[in-house]
């Protein structure tokens, strides 16, 4: 996770600490994420920013016990984000919970996207 984050973001200076845990769920990946931003963001600002990002769905209504859960992500090409809250241990810190269907968002979706690019850019000429 550490190396992948730096590689995907193209920035070796990104500091990541990760712990991986395998739990018995049918499918899906879940992550507890803690970030520190350059400037202070309120949880509401973070929700608004994330809600505009392609492929992200904010599911964050603690009053109604609505949080991202692997079962809710199943069968979707979306990453669900919720439990967005301030991290009081960092000046500009936020915590949130992320879930996704790893079959759709992982290898299967990547394979389809690669095939689409091959067809569009190389096979339809």
Predicted regions and their residues:
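NAD(P)-dependent Rossmann-like dehydrogenase/reductase catalytic/cofactor-binding core
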Residues: 78-80, 86-125
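C-terminal substrate-binding/catalytic lobe of Rossmann-fold NAD(P)-dependent oxidoreductases
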Residues: 1-95
């Amino acid at each position: 996770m550490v190396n992948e984050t730096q590689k995907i973001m193209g920035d070796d200076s990104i500091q990541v600490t990760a712990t991986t845990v395998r739990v018995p769920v049918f499918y899906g990946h879940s992550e507890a994420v803690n970030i520190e931003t350059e400037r202070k963001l309120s949880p509401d600002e973070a929700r608004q920013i994330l809600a505009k990002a392609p492929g992200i769905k904010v599911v964050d209504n603690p009053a109604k016990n609505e949080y991202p859960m692997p079962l809710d992500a199943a069968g979707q090409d979306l990453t669900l984000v919720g439990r967005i809250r301030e991290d009081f241990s960092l000046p500009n810190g936020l915590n949130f919970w992320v879930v996704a269907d790893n079959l759709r968002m992982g290898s299967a979706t990547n394979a389809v996207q690669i095939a689409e690019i091959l067809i569009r850019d190389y096979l339809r000429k």
